Design a protein with these regions (language model features):
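Phosphate/diphosphate-binding glycine-rich loops and adjacent basic-rich segments that engage nucleotide
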Residues: 1-35, 162
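Short, contiguous, pocket-lining structural segments
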Residues: 9-20, 45-52, 73
């Protein structure tokens, strides 16, 4: 309780919800060849490499960071951070802006923000829970490893849920049940 939640920015969808991505591509006039505003193709954005964090985690541990929990944010989206065993509330105050790919998927599938953040990483790739006293040093080490990170939120006493304040979204523990 009281831990900071540090998010690392994602590089893309990380091979999750591929069926939904495929369905979205079929609805685009040019499919995977649809151009994004940065000049990349939709298909290239889908295939963005997944970041690997083994060296980063080792560096954090070597620098004395007291990591309490780590999770990737894939398949269940941001809801995945409540997979920790304890009954706690995860309050997200700050999030990365989703990549354009996610906005396109949302526009052609008509999914709500709640559906999108509950399915995709929406720009958040990895969550690291550390004591508040370690946040600054954690962010520094992450940046040294060439990743972007933010102090996204805090773990609080309460029922098992994730609250994404900037989007006014709340997920209860029941939303992690298999669909």
């Amino acid at each position: 309780m009281g831990d900071a939640i540090v998010f690392i920015q994602s590089s893309g969808p990380n091979a999750n919800a591929v069926s939904l991505i495929r369905a979205a591509a079929k609805k685009l006039k040019k499919g995977y060849l649809t151009k994004l505003s940065d000049g990349k193709l939709f298909g290239e954005a889908v295939l963005a490499k997944t970041n690997i964090y083994a060296r980063l985690v080792q560096d954090l541990l070597n620098e004395g960071i007291d990591i309490h929990y780590i999770t990737n944010i894939t398949g269940h989206g941001v809801r995945k951070i409540m997979r920790a065993k304890r009954e706690l509330t995860y309050v997200i105050e700050k999030i990365f802006k989703p990549q354009e790919l996610f906005k396109i998927i949302q526009s052609v599938t008509n999914l709500t923000d709640k559906d999108m953040y509950g399915t995709f990483n929406m720009g958040q790739d990895y969550a690291i829970f550390v004591p508040q006293k370690d946040v600054s040093k954690t962010l520094q080490i992450i940046r040294k490893n060439k990743f972007k990170a933010i102090n996204a939120g805090v773990v609080k006493k309460g029922g098992k849920q994730v609250i994404i304040k900037p989007k006014k979204i709340t997920y209860s523990s029941e939303t992690l049940d298999l669909r």
